[in-house]
Amino acid sequence: MISMIDRIKKYFKNNWVPWLITVVAVITVSLFQWVGAFDTLELKMYDYRFNTVRGPLTGWMASDSTYIKKGTDVVLVEVDDEAWRLVPEEWPYPRGGIWAKAIRNLYKAGAKVIVFDIQFDSPENRSEIYKDLIQTTTTDYILNQVPSLRDSTQAEYIQNSLPKLIPRHGDDMLGEAVAEAQMFGTTVIMPAKMVTEPTSVPPQYIAYPVRQIMNANPELGLINDQMDLDGFSRRYSLFDVMAHEPDKYYLTLGVKAFKAFEDIPDTAKPYFDSENLIWSYGNHKIKAYGQGNSFLVNYYGPPSGYKVRDERNLPAWSTFPKYSLAYIIDTEDVTLRDPMEDLDWMTQFLPGEIPEWIMAIEDDSERVEMMEAMGITEGNDISNSPFNNKIVVIGTSVEVHHDYKQTPYYNFSGIQQLTPGMETHANAIQTMLDKNYINVLGGGLTEFFNEFNKYPFSHILLITLLSFVALLILLFVNPIIAGFLILVTCLVYFAIGCGLFIGDIFWGIKSFAPSLFESKLPEIGESYIIPIVPPLVSVGVTYIGIVLYDFIMEQQDKKYLKNTFGAYISPDLILSLIHISEPTRPERIS
């Protein structure tokens, strides 16, 4: 027993420096991770899992049909290039003629929730001009402008007729459409924004929609973004608070849509379990990212409407069902700019209505055949509507509006592609509805150096484990072989880290021969994230530190032997003496 203890003491006496180097490497790398030195690289590795390892969950590029068969609860209605070309009005579109029409058509088509990602926080300009014209036009002004009028009675008649000749205020019409939709059971959610102005008192306030919309009592949701340090959108806030009202939660747009769709009562309030990093909202559990009020969005795919511009003529990615605003307003009373595309498309989804051009088909059999091809029945059952019992997110994707975000799919398929801001809400909503949250070891990956996130002990253990694996390899084999084995260890760890995201730790092996293995998407809630960069850096620091130490000590040994025996022994014999003790880690010559 004593001899064993002596051997252990002797071992550590001769090898304490490599162990010390390893401990220092663990501490140093952990400190660097804590202050955020690896955050940018770690975030890029996070994105790599989405755009390369897993790919989309929905759309035609999905590796299997698990999520496609299930379908999504979110439908997009976009001001896209098609709407820009076909809508018979210039931007900004009239609130009464376009947006009110869209709301009415969607609620009639069965939409359960209508979410606007377009702000209406200032009065409609064209309606204000008409309003000002009515208010400032006097009988004297009319008499002066129309010399043929001689009688003030005629001028008064014209003055009284002006309000009937000029279109109604667009804000009034939009507010009425919101109220009408909600009366028929469709929840309308309007965006609000938390604004900070240092010169105002208090410095923070909420920019609400205009009075007419507020009078319709819509749901309101914040649209303030939460960006990572590299400007990408990966997280989504549940709520925000103002400094002077820290106990009042203002829910975000996506959470309000989730609340309306799941019928969560107004009395429910998010509560945080700091031990398990879980937000409880109603009967639902939301996995928080760190100690903050946000969660990681499990993006379902790249931008739905993006098409690769090359000779392959591939279809759009189609992550979510997407429809142009032009077709949502396209009924008999709206004429699109291009008559060839004016098919009254939306009429087929409205109860009891059949497009006029179909009714104009004289041959009964042809008319029935066309109705069957279009999915139209005599009663026009809304169960065939793509909007029935769906959350419809309305926003803009046209390039001139610059409402785009960088997401984990920014480099999908090797092509840089921005995601419309409205789709960040859609992905967040679908993540909550499916409970498809991302599990992160320790609760977070980045930004530990702030008051909200605690540095997880599990990360230190992971860094320590890989560093000591590198140490043990170096203790038993020479640096060249050790370097190869450590490289293999790093590749295995990288493959496992990526594989955990798709629920398959053998992803690394399968990726070398994808045609031989069936590719499957992870089940709901089965995506796991572990830190990749800090553990790999710790391995590199450990290896370099120990090899550098060995090199320095070897040079000192050579110098000592040369100075001591150089006059008596040949140089070749001196070099061979350095490696006499053992072939892998020589005892130091004292």
What are these regions (language model features)?
Residues 2-292, 296, 300-302, 387-479:
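Non-transmembrane functional regions of envelope-associated proteins
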Residues 434, 438, 444-548:
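Transmembrane alpha-helical segments that form the functional core of multipass membrane systems
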Residues 52, 56-65, 557, 567-577:
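Membrane-interface segments at or immediately adjacent to transmembrane helices
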Residues 316-378:
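Long, low-complexity, polar/charged, intrinsically disordered or flexibly structured peripheral segments
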Residues 413-419, 548-552, 581:
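Short, contiguous acidic/charged loop-to-helix segments that flank catalytic cores in large enzymes
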Residues 150-172, 362-386, 521-526:
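Intrinsically disordered, low-complexity acidic Ser/Thr-rich regulatory segments
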